[in-house]
């Protein structure tokens, strides 16, 4: 049987309540006090009920906080042995998932997930007698506790005009209210909860955000200076839309915010992932910042932040972690801190981003069965050195850093693909690097 856990917990199409029940039993064998939250998906209550039944039947206690954003669950996990979020994040509505957090608000790492997975696969459960069945509680203050903590730690002096796109998801319960409490004039869209995501799909990309982007462009024709903040299905991510109605380039925004955090805090360590652009290295070069690259995934970023005492770490996708507040990826807090950055520099978002150079990014995914990925990557590492004339970094897959750009070849953690991503300063170089990367992977597959 393959792994249940991928790069972001358990996530699958038509997640079965049978799996959720077994996860609950496995969790209860190791942890007794559990807090559970869910996003707006139509299967959320079903999965929560099955998961809770497993925990109770294993002798654990459950506190439900109902529909909440993932950062609210992660923040409240500090009061329990473990937190469990039922969400498939940015995936379409037919998907659901289960993500576990420790009491520091840090998502489970591979070792912790493996322990739960082993119990499930061996069916090494303990089902208690009737007199030892656990109890279930409800905490109605979970969102308020989180909001009060954020309000104490974020300060925005400027009165910003903000369009917030909540994706018909759990951000509806928090994001518009926090921004308003901090003095913003807020227009919220897709702000009623609907697990079918009828306003737009939960992936906050350019296609799904077109209406919101056009709305901001129209509002600003009259000089209103709105910017946009959009969330995914569980609000652990954030993307920004500038005053011209353009989706902010993910890598540029990450670089700009990283620079702001260095200048504000004096902490010169920034953690990001192997797939992040070389923009961040070049934009922060004059500040003598150490850029620490990790495997893709918020767990790897958070663990490296702890290890290096970094204040900020993030992925280009908009999954950002603010260690001075908590260790759960937080799209709501990230949106507020983008406004803090604009306040700090007294500039518009487009002015900051347009100062940063643009590079060419290309990517491709090549079908590869999960049981072949390890052999393919061994071939890539062994033969890529002679092809690219450089020794690859192998933090996550193989990254070849070159004079004219870089090539990253890595196995997907959630799908049967090998992903190839390249970056260069012009189209010609980027296309050549992509062709080389694809050719190398196909050679590896042919050699099996």
UniProtKB/Swiss-Prot annotation:
One GO biological-process annotation of the entry reads: carbohydrate metabolic process
Q: Which Enzyme Commission number(s) are listed?
A: 5.4.2.10
Q: Which reaction does it catalyse?
A: alpha-D-glucosamine 1-phosphate = D-glucosamine 6-phosphate
Does the keyword field hold Metal-binding?
yes
* Top-level EC class: isomerase
Which residues carry the post-translational modification Phosphoserine, per the record? 89
Binding of Mg(2+), residues: 89, 232, 234, 236
GO terms for MF: magnesium ion binding; phosphoglucosamine mutase activity; phosphomannomutase activity
Q: Which domain of life is it from?
A: Archaea
UniProt PTM = Activated by phosphorylation.
How the cofactor is bound: the record states: Binds 1 Mg(2+) ion per subunit.
Q: Which residues form the active site?
A: 89 (phosphoserine intermediate)
Could you tell me the keywords of this UniProt record?
Answer: Isomerase, Magnesium, Metal-binding, Phosphoprotein
Question: PROSITE patterns, alphabetically?
Answer: PGM_PMM
Xref: Pfam families:
PGM_PMM_I, PGM_PMM_II, PGM_PMM_III, PGM_PMM_IV
Give the family per the record. Answer: Belongs to the phosphohexose mutase family.
Q: What is the recorded name of this protein?
A: Phosphoglucosamine mutase
Organism of this sequence: Methanocaldococcus jannaschii (strain ATCC 43067 / DSM 2661 / JAL-1 / JCM 10045 / NBRC 100440) (Methanococcus jannaschii)
- Report which gene this protein is encoded by: glmM
């Amino acid at each position: 049987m393959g792994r249940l856990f991928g790069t972001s917990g358990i996530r699958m199409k038509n997640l079965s309540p049978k799996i959720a029940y077994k996860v609950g039993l496995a969790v209860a064998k190791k942890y007794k006090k559990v807090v559970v939250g869910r996003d707006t998906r139509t299967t959320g209550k079903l999965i929560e009920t099955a998961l809770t039944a497993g925990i109770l039947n294993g002798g654990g206690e459950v506190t439900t906080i109902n529909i909440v954003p993932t950062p609210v669950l992660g923040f409240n996990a500090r009061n329990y042995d473990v937190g469990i979020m039922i969400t498939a994040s940015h995936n379409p509505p037919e998907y659901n998932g289960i993500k576990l957090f420790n009491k520091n608000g840090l998502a489970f790492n591979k070792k912790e997930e493996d322990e739960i997975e082993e119990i499930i696969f061996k069916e090494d459960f303990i089902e208690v007698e009737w007199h030892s069945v656990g109890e279930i509680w409800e905490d109605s203050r979970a969102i308020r506790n989180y909001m009060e903590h954020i309000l104490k730690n974020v300060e925005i002096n400027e009165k910003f005009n903000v369009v917030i796109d909540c994706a018909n998801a759990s951000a509806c319960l928090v994001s518009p209210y926090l921004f308003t409490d901090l003095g913003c004039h807020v227009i919220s869209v897709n702000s009623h909860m609907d697990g079918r995501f009828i306003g737009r799909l939960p992936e906050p990309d350019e296609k799904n955000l077109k209406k919101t982007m056009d709305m901001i462009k129209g509002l600003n024709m009259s000089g209103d200076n709105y910017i946009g903040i959009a969330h995914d299905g569980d609000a652990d991510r954030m993307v920004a839309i500038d005053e011209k109605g353009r989706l902010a380039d993910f890598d540029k925004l990450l670089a700009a915010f990283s620079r702001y955090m260095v200048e504000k805090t004096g902490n010169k360590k920034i953690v990001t992932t192997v797939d992040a652009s070389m923009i961040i290295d070049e934009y922060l070069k004059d500040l003598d910042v150490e850029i620490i690259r990790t495997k893709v995934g918020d767990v790897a970023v958070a663990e490296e932040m702890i290890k290096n005492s970094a204040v900020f770490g993030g992925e280009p996708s908009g999954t950002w972690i603010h260690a001075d507040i908590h260790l759960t990826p937080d799209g709501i807090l990230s949106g507020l801190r983008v406004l803090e950055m604009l306040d700090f520099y007294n500039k518009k978002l487009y002015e900051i981003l347009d100062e940063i150079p643009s590079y060419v990014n290309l990517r491709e995914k090549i079908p590869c069965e999960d049981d072949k990925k390890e052999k393919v990557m061994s071939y890539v590492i062994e033969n890529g050195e002679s092809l690219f004339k450089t020794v690859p970094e192998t933090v996550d897959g193989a990254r070849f850093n070159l004079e004219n750009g870089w090539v990253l070849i890595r196995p997907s953690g959630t799908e049967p693909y090998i992903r190839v991503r390249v970056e260069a300063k012009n189209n010609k170089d980027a296309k050549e690097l992509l062709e080389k990367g694809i050719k190398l992977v196909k050679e590896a597959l042919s050699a099996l």
